From Swiss-Prot:
The lineage of its organism: Eukaryota, Viridiplantae, Streptophyta, Embryophyta, Tracheophyta. It comes from the Eukaryota. One of its GO terms (cellular component) is nucleus. It comes from Petroselinum crispum (Parsley). GO terms for molecular function: abscisic acid binding; protein phosphatase inhibitor activity; signaling receptor activity. One of its GO terms (biological process) is abscisic acid-activated signaling pathway. SUPFAM superfamilies: Bet v1-like. The gene is PCPR1-1. Keywords: Pathogenesis-related protein, Plant defense. Belongs to the BetVI family. This is Pathogenesis-related protein A. The keyword NADP does not apply.
Length: 155
């Protein structure tokens, strides 16, 4: 299995607690409001929203993909850390075993936060994820971040 990793860091004027809640805990209800074309629906297949929960996400018309199955790997409300894995769906392109996503919001002295996002692509065999796919994943995460951030600032 091959492993490729991408890390992105950005800052926000929104507090770490509020951003963590919006981007991680409330994302299933918030995302359809702020980016209507991103997802059509999300259904819980197993669990209660905590660690181990498995969700089937039906992506919206703005996405080139149709579905993805996500599993919540870790939630730490004290450190504003959330991790989940994409374990199934056409988003895996047939040569990716899974995609691990890690999000941390670190409080800043000014009341805002620094957001650290890590994506780990676990490929089948010796497959390599093309750079344009990695860039697409980072761009999608940034688009979601900016939309949620704008909503939280306005509300």
């Amino acid at each position: 299995m091959g492993v490729q990793k991408s890390e992105v860091e950005t800052t926000s004027s929104v507090s770490a607690e509020k951003l963590f809640k919006g981007l991680c805990l409330d994302i299933d209800t918030l995302l359809p409001q702020v980016l209507p074309g991103a997802i059509k629906s999300s259904e819980t297949l197993e669990g209660d929203g905590g660690v181990g929960t498995v969700k089937l996400v039906h992506l919206g018309d703005a996405s080139p993909f149709k579905t993805m199955k996500q599993k919540v790997d870790a939630i730490d409300k004290a450190t504003f850390t959330y991790s989940y894995s994409i374990i199934d769906g056409d988003i895996l392109l047939g040569f990716i075993e899974s995609i691990n996503n890690h999000f941390t919001a670190v409080p800043n002295a000014d009341g805002g936060c620094t957001v650290k996002s890590t994506i780990i692509f676990n490929t089948k065999g010796d497959a390599v994820v093309p750079e344009e796919n990695i860039k697409f994943a980072n761009d999608q995460n940034l688009t979601i971040f900016k939309a949620v951030e704008a909503y939280l600032i306005a509300n």
